[in-house]
A protein has these predicted regions:
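Structured alpha/beta or helical-core interaction and ligand-binding surfaces enriched in interleaved
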Residues: 1-124, 132-135
Length: 135
């Protein structure tokens, strides 16, 4: 398991007072879902507001792709998600965006200085949050 990705995500985008708990949960298999659940509905409690570039339900795939191209790591990155088939996998931005759009649960894509988080889908489109550590 690549815990460097989790540590990078936590240190860049989580508020300082919540980092230790989130990292503990992400690293412990029996608690991993607890950590991901925190981003389903009340992500604003955990994310560093200063790093949020954009959030909403109407963010297009094109916008997501453009921000990854501008601030990401050569169009590749890592997923952190509920679906174990993709969790901690390296993949292209296109593949990650497809997973973010089509999976009903929370998913995070980290690429370079950008992170895209999709919340749990309840009704209508999912909420998408774009974070950037150098914006």
């Amino acid at each position: 398991m690549n815990t460097d990705i989790e540590e990078l995500f936590v240190n860049k985008y989580i508020v300082k007072q919540k980092r230790e708990r989130i990292l503990f949960e992400l690293r412990k298999p029996s608690k991993r879902i607890d950590a991901l659940s925190r981003f389903c509905h009340n992500y604003d409690t955990y994310l560093d507001e200063r790093k949020i570039v954009k959030r909403g339900k109407k963010i297009t795939d094109k916008e997501l792709k453009e921000i990854v191209e501008k601030y990401g790591n050569k169009n590749k990155g890592f997923m952190i998600c509920w679906d174990k088939r993709y969790d901690l996998m390296e993949m292209t931005a296109d593949t990650a965006i497809s997973i973010i759009r089509n999976d009903g649960m929370c998913a995070l894509f980290i690429s370079g200085d950008v992170c895209i988080i999709s919340t749990e889908q309840i009704q209508g489109p999912k909420e998408i949050v774009i974070l950037c550590s150098v914006y």
